[in-house]
Design a protein with these regions (language model features):
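Soluble "head" domains of membrane/secretory-pathway proteins
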Residues: 1-27, 46-52, 57-264
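Hydrophobic membrane-insertion alpha-helices, especially the h-region
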Residues: 32-47
């Protein structure tokens, strides 16, 4: 009896250690990664945005299949006091800009800014005149040889379909044969000047539509417009990626920085 009492007393004084909380380890691990993923997603959507070039309108500066990271903090938000607190910069002529398409804001476009508020723009035989001065544009690519009176001599009477915004531009913002860019708006064109659906057809880019500017090509892959325009990855595109990833990746363009130019 005395031995049993001693054993009970010993158990009370030295209770057995509880088993390790195995469930706490995965819970903590999951919690840490959840926070990390949230931060990554927040940073990706707030600071930078991924974008892929689906068409050839910016050739040869940007090619179909170039995957970009877009700096969303590059430009000061219009009408926000925060533009005085952070090192933003204004949208400049020659900048490559990413923006919501004015005709359908669900679509994202990338073009070169050719005119800022107050600028006067016209094209004569494909040559751009900015505020009365002909521009030297080494970045421009002319892919087709057939003439188009509206495309090449702008503004003029359209011989092709233009959108309501483009018609409004022609009706209300042409002075002495030149388009005058209104306040809080920008005139954008593709570097592939002969094959670009741009401000000549759908008018100005509102300041509020501008998302940012490209920073870097993080991957460049030789894919078709059909594959890249599809919101879901087709089986054929997936097979093509698996079979030709190394041969169709443009390694010289991958991790290439994207720069604007000085247009004056």
């Amino acid at each position: 009896v005395e031995q049993k009492k001693a054993a009970i007393v010993a158990d009370v004084k030295n209770p057995p250690s509880p088993p390790p909380a195995k469930a706490d380890l995965p819970r903590g691990f999951i919690a840490e990664w959840t926070v990390t993923i949230i931060l990554l997603l927040f940073g990706t959507t707030t600071l930078v945005q991924a974008f892929v070039i689906p068409t050839g309108s910016m050739e040869d500066t940007l090619l179909i299949g170039d995957h970009l990271l877009v700096d969303k903090l590059a430009y000061a938000p219009a009408g926000r006091i925060s533009k005085y607190l952070l090192p933003y910069e204004p949208v400049k002529r020659g900048d490559i800009i990413v923006f919501r398409y004015p005709v359908d804001i669900r679509q994202t476009f990338v073009k070169r800014c050719m005119g800022v508020p107050g600028d006067r723009i016209k094209l004569v035989n494909k040559e751009v005149y900015l505020n009365g001065k002909k521009l030297v544009e080494p970045y421009v690519y002319h892919k087709t040889e057939y003439p188009d009176s509206y495309r090449d001599n702008f503004p003029s009477d359209p011989n092709v379909h233009i959108y309501d915004q483009g018609q409004d531009m022609l009706d209300h913002h042409v002075v002495n044969g030149e388009v005058v860019v209104p306040p809080d708006s920008y005139f954008a064109m593709g570097d592939n000047r002969d094959s670009s659906l741009d401000s000549r057809y759908w008018g100005f880019v509102p300041r509020a539509n501008i998302i940012g500017k490209p920073l870097i090509i993080y991957w460049s892959y030789d894919a078709s417009t059909e594959d890249l325009s599809n919101p879901t990855i087709s089986v054929d595109h997936l097979v093509d990626l698996m079979e030709h990833f190394f041969t169709k990746t443009r390694w010289r363009r991958t991790f290439m920085l994207v720069h604007g130019v000085n247009v004056n």
